[in-house]
């Protein structure tokens, strides 16, 4: 959906070693390489093909090491790295099913809101900014929890909770049981007086020699619509950051880096590299049995504090790329696909005409 057939063909044919696979070819039943974006990741018509290299990994067999909002941070903490821990937000897992059985347990979280501490509360299996709320008092937290229980408790009446633990993430999403209360960054670095976050891209490559990772050396900047203030937390125009909220297309380099200077830019990039090197260590995601090699395209959401420390918000396993009106060079689907082919596909199938590394924006190996 993001890529056009003619653009894919041009990118591959330039290398001099690729031909388009023909499904009716009787002498070659399987392609050597399959790439699908998020819109075709569940296309059953492709399941019959056994390509040595494919752009899908078996996330369901990985015990949620990366795309689960709560487990990702907990797994990173297990690396026992103080520098890494400084990049992670405090968090608590909230089980609505348990609270419904004993609502008095909600008092266990009251102390978290002392000294006007602000938290963001989000459903673990949500995406696209849904089921997320910022809370600045225990009373508001309690009110939201009670509302959520009231709306969903009928689903839980006949639920076999032991079976629930073993069902897939999509089905779990129907029950709204597992939530995470995550520390809210209330001292963000601002751009033109607006809150923003970094949207980055990360490639995970599974080979027979171990895991490899690549991170884009630049980031899109998603801003809030209105200028930042430390209150009115339910006002999404102030506190929600999205690509369509920005009045112009903004990147970390040069837009932010020119404002904060070379020293702070380097400091931030070093933290980003440490974060993704660590993420690469905890991923155990295998290929599907029919593929010898595989890779996956992830997006990351990172916020920078006023003292130039990064904080990981989450990793997105199915990142939607901006539409044509909002895209730019580093989020352009053709650019990303070319970099996937250069960094991963060309390693398996050596091109006759190797491409050059882009001058400014490119993926670097971790």
Language-model features: locations:
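Catalytic-loop signature of eukaryotic-like protein kinases
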Residues: 301
